Amino acid sequence: MSYFGTDGIRGKFGEMPITPEFALKLGFAAGKVLKRTSPINKPIVVLGKDTRLSGYILESALQAGLNAAGVYVHLLGPLPTPAIAHLTRALHADAGIVISASHNPYFDNGIKFFSGEGKKLPDSLQDEINQELEHELHIEDTANLGKSVRLIDANGRYIEFCKSTFPYHFDLRNLTIVVDCANGAAYNVGPSVFRELGAKVIALYNDPNGMNINEHCGSTHPENLQKAVVHYKADLGIAFDGDADRVILVDKFGELVDGDHILYILATQAKKKPAGIVGTVMSNMALELALAKADVPFIRAKVGDRYVLQALEENDWVTGGEPSGHILTLDKSTTGDAIIAALQVLTVMVEQNKALHELVTGFELFPQVLVNVRLDQMMDPYSVPALVSEFEQAEAQLKGRGRLLIRKSGTEPVIRVMVEGDNQKEVTDLAHRLAESVRTHAA
């Protein structure tokens, strides 16, 4: 049985596999694999988390399992997921582990691994850990147990790293920035980075209590940030998600600037244009057309930063992302980093001496309607000839003006029907008609 999904192991705390007992076994299994594959006798693992209450319990269980397997653990405390990836590399650790469920509610949690290079763990190592989990936890030699130590200045190290990605001769002294920390992992380091670069920072949702992470705040709920930017007459707003690997921006008028806008800015407005951009099947068609006009190659990957990263590496490109705000800049970081992505946009604002809204003037997203069809039992819509015929008719109707995407959820019995085009009413009507057809044929 494989416990790993596309983004590690995730679920509701207290239910398998997100339990203290499983975390202990997982730590031991991962430790045994690292002992076999590490070039040193005492492998080192960097362990961090977000601000969920359950993170403390899972942290204790994981470190106990790792120590029992003979692994040394550096405890980082609450830090963004990309910070754990960076510190894994900086400390020359054998692996990094993040305890987080990203943008999910507080009662969920998850565990994911980074390789020593700060990248997602290879599938081959995940398979080895899965196999090791089938064995009983058995300590053979107490003389070879590992230890855990707390890294005293983990926050400071990561703050300095983020600042190093911003041009040394630039500063943010003339900007007022509202930062929504989602009561998550960036509650401390996020505002600090922008303050230390000279900005006047107004921090929101930076008081985590273990249960308020992502609660009506952060990149998935930016409404209050939009109001705050206008209220404080700020230059822009920055919203992170719970583990700060996603970012959504807000211009001074309170308008949202999502991942597609950010990729547009980095591809067309920066002094140095990227060799190409990787989006996903969810990236707006307007981005594809705008990049073609700017003569910047664009390809689509499957949904998920793992697939964006894979496509970037295959094409030897550095910039890619998703509309949700997962932005990768591989010349700066090995994984999606909300703070660094925001800094790259701020770099363009400073070098062009333009406000955020000016960088996206003339770039308008096509209307996009997503309808989630919840089913009693999952089915493949492309296995039903009548549905396939309807999909083909819709694609012919939208040809050159829009597109259709029908996909199954990877985590629940849901079919996602997405229609995009240049006419809002047409897109809305088509999405709901196709969704109803899927619902009818699934009954």
UniProtKB/Swiss-Prot annotation:
Keyword Metal-binding: yes
Organism: Acinetobacter baylyi (strain ATCC 33305 / BD413 / ADP1)
Gene (name only): glmM
Sorted UniProt keywords: Isomerase, Magnesium, Metal-binding, Phosphoprotein
A single cellular component GO annotation: cytosol
Signal peptide residue numbers: none
Cofactor(s) the protein requires to work: Mg(2+)
Binding residues for Mg(2+): S102, D241, D243, D245
Enzyme Commission code(s) on record: 5.4.2.10
Record carries keyword ATP-binding: no
Protein name, per record: Phosphoglucosamine mutase
